[in-house]
Amino acid sequence: MTEIVADKTVEVVKNAIETADGALDLYNKYLDQVIPWQTFDETIKELSRFKQEYSQAASVLVGDIKTLLMDSQDKYFEATQTVYEWCGVATQLLAAYILLFDEYNEKKASAPH
């Protein structure tokens, strides 16, 4: 009976790992399509290219816009890094959890601790 429960638990955890892996792939594909990084970089370059032609007021505004664009890119990469770190930790923990059931047997379970 206990072995059946262990097998079922291992299956649930394996499904969770596969689901998390699929979600991470979807996350990457979706964001790569939503955020046009090439256009993003080209916009920053174009704003810089014409900096000599801006008025004083316009140069302040364009500077603020460039700062916001670059800050948003930094925040995106920080958030993405956090997602990858959590996935890495979760994957290791779930793999260790599965090992507990792969090495499970009745003698070990009933042995005094």
UniProtKB/Swiss-Prot annotation:
- Name any one Pfam family assigned in the record: HlyE
User: Which InterPro entries does its entry note?
Assistant: Hemolysin_E
- What processes does the entry annotate via GO biological process terms? hemolysis in another organism
Q: Using the chain's own numbering, where are the disulfide bonds?
A: none
Family in the record: Belongs to the hemolysin E family.
Protein name, as recorded: Putative hemolysin E-like protein
Organism in which the protein naturally occurs: Shigella flexneri
